[in-house]
């Protein structure tokens, strides 16, 4: 508790000292600025001192030269802007044109959507006209014609002759099999009849 008054006094003294220092520095700055403004001389006054008495024409010449210089500076500063602005506009137009060309859609998707009946549409830029890629079995400008398969006569003739030969061979084989079975049966019957006749003869002789 005893330290608090001493700390407060120290802070108060430090604040007073800083206020005094800042006030002195501000006064010094003000004095320096006042001295500088009093020593400065305007350029018109210096030129007036250099010019002889009665030199009004010289002043007019200097004023005209300064005005010409100002005009030249203004023209020089404005010309690059005039040259630069058209180039930017032209670049923007070119970019827009390029974007427009890239966004062009295929005419086959809209205008010639139903041009090809049995095929796919393809737009030829060189001819500026659509063309069709026909599906297999169709032909024509719009793939509207159906192409029928053409049979070869020689091929059909060979096919029929082969079928006829096969039929004849199969029929002949069947006939041979049937004849063989009949002959086998006939021979078997003949042997059976001979045996029966012999048995009959033996029975007759035995009865006697």
Swiss-Prot record:
SUPFAM superfamilies: EGF/Laminin
GO biological process: cell chemotaxis; epidermal growth factor receptor signaling pathway; ERBB2-EGFR signaling pathway; ERBB2-ERBB4 signaling pathway; positive regulation of cell population proliferation; positive regulation of keratinocyte migration; positive regulation of phosphatidylinositol 3-kinase/protein kinase B signal transduction; positive regulation of smooth muscle cell proliferation
Extracellular side: 24-161
PTM note: O-glycosylated.
Known glycosylation sites: 85
Signal sequence extent: 1-23
Biological role: Growth factor that mediates its effects via EGFR, ERBB2 and ERBB4. Required for normal cardiac valve formation and normal heart function. Promotes smooth muscle cell proliferation. May be involved in macrophage-mediated cellular proliferation. It is mitogenic for fibroblasts, but not endothelial cells. It is able to bind EGF receptor/EGFR with higher affinity than EGF itself and is a far more potent mitogen for smooth muscle cells than EGF. Also acts as a diphtheria toxin receptor.
Protein name per its UniProtKB record: Proheparin-binding EGF-like growth factor
Species, as recorded: Sus scrofa (Pig)
Taxonomy of the source species: Eukaryota, Metazoa, Chordata, Craniata, Vertebrata
